[in-house]
């Protein structure tokens, strides 16, 4: 009896994190499908919610939507902010994305902030 109770508790403790992440992963996939089908009004709230929970892919997608103006006016400052938040994760894709975004948004009239300036 004690052994079966321990097994049940162990199973619940080990699978709970997987189950909670499963919902967020599905939300991310749903948001990406909305974005792919240009349903930005449905995609953005899902992506923003995940981005605020430190999902790197969602942070990069939010930055991309701000940079491209998908669903609203372009906002380079917000795009750089979210790219910097993604870069803080240490993910090399996020670093590469942030650098490309900074190069893409740089012009005579706009110089993107460094990440150290963004979080002051």
Task: Please give the residue ranges for each predicted region.
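Bacterial N-terminal signal peptides that target proteins for export
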Residues: 1-8
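N-terminal signal peptide c-region/cleavage motif recognized by signal peptidases
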Residues: 17-19
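Short helix-capping/linker turns of helical repeat alpha-solenoids
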Residues: 23, 34, 38-39, 52-55, ...
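Terminal, low-structured helical/coil segments at or just beyond the last alpha-helical repeat
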Residues: 95-120
